[in-house]
């Protein structure tokens, strides 16, 4: 996926799912399922329910995403 093709949105983690998947509610009200990006996984970034995160989504499937940043 090319970097210019992604849609970045802010959201809040609603629920933790198996296999490091998370249910995230975006600012516009949509709920997506997102996984952790490789760099966050490598650096052991912990994500908990209620955290504010940045989610990257592809325009081809807007129901799935990748968590690329966790706000402090």
From Swiss-Prot:
Assigned keywords, A-Z: Cytoplasm, Initiation factor, Protein biosynthesis, RNA-binding, rRNA-binding
Gene3D superfamilies for this protein: Nucleic acid-binding proteins
GO cellular component, one term: cytosol
Keyword ATP-binding: no
GO terms of molecular function: ribosome binding; rRNA binding; translation initiation factor activity
The UniProt record lists the keyword Cytoplasm: yes
Pfam families documented for this protein: eIF-1a (PF01176)
InterPro entries: NA-bd_OB-fold (IPR012340), RNA-binding_domain_S1_IF1 (IPR006196), S1_domain (IPR003029), TIF_IF1 (IPR004368)
HAMAP family: IF_1
UniProt similarity note: Belongs to the IF-1 family.
Protein name: Translation initiation factor IF-1
Organism encoding this protein: Pseudoalteromonas translucida (strain TAC 125)
């Amino acid at each position: 996926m090319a970097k210019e093709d992604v849609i970045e949105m802010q959201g809040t983690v609603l629920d933790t799912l198996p296999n490091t998947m998370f249910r995230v509610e975006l600012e516009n009200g949509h709920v997506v399922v997102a996984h952790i990006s490789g760099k966050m996984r490598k650096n052991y970034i912990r994500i908990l329910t209620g955290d504010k995160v940045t989610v990257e989504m592809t325009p081809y499937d807007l129901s799935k995403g990748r968590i690329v940043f966790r706000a402090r």
